[in-house]
Amino acid sequence: MAHIARKRFGQHFLSDGGIIDAIVQEIAPQPGDAMVEIGPGLAALTQPLVERLGRLTVIELDRDLAKRLREHPQLEVIESDVLKVDFAALATRFAAPLRVVGNLPYNISTPILFHLLGFAHLIADQHFMLQKEVIDRMVARPATSDYSRLSVMLQWRYRMENVLFVPPESFDPPPRVDSAVVRMVPLAEPPAVDAARLGEIVQVAFSQRRKIMRHTLGKWLDEHGFAGQFDAQRRAEEVPVAEYVALAQAVPPRP
């Protein structure tokens, strides 16, 4: 019996052979890579990957799909919500930096990206299929309409690029949005910063993104003992990533 895509899992299965080949080419898997695939689904991407790798670890939440995948002798199947997976344990077991790939469920793609952010020091690279509008925000530059909290929180830790456009008809069932593939490579020497403090600052800044920050981030900085110079007569989208990082480094630590 054919598997029916489940809306609650945000399932849209890749079915275009040409697109699949293009994605595999961008990933460039090599035998022995410590690769982990999130959401393998019906194995459209899984099969060409494992043919090149020899072995592949996959994370699948859907019980029926996980059962099917276990029939493949070259796959290690982790039946779990990816947000509960300890990627540090996987990296330790592989004794190598992880390569993480996947057609991410669009309904929880941002939480997955933030979950992986905590393991970036253990990851060699990431290749994900996502909504194109999400990738546009991820790679956006300051002073553009797509520049957002997501832009800042990923760009301080990754070098990213949109490598492939994927139209809706490449999926079954077709989503109502355009998709794309993003490459994410963790920076070899990221700035030394408290990620939680940076996240707090960025969240406050973008809480009213169309207004100047005098009454949002400016007020927050005063309340947290910041004694440096910061122009709060700007909108959050006008502030470069490096300046947010510098703020997080300069604000006194919590008592």
UniProtKB/Swiss-Prot annotation:
Top-level division of the source organism's lineage: Bacteria
PROSITE patterns: RRNA_A_DIMETH, SAM_RNA_A_N6_MT
InterPro entries: KsgA/Erm, rRNA_Ade_diMease-like_C, rRNA_Ade_Mease_Trfase_CS, rRNA_Ade_methylase_Trfase_N, rRNA_adenine_dimethylase, SAM-dependent_MTases_sf
Enzyme Commission number(s) from the entry: 2.1.1.182
Sites where the protein binds S-adenosyl-L-methionine: 12, 14, 39, 60, 81, 103
Record keywords: Cytoplasm, Methyltransferase, RNA-binding, rRNA processing, S-adenosyl-L-methionine, Transferase
Stated family: Belongs to the class I-like SAM-binding methyltransferase superfamily. rRNA adenine N(6)-methyltransferase family. RsmA subfamily.
The protein's name in its UniProt record: Ribosomal RNA small subunit methyltransferase A
Native organism taxonomy: Bacteria, Pseudomonadati, Pseudomonadota, Betaproteobacteria, Burkholderiales
Gene: rsmA
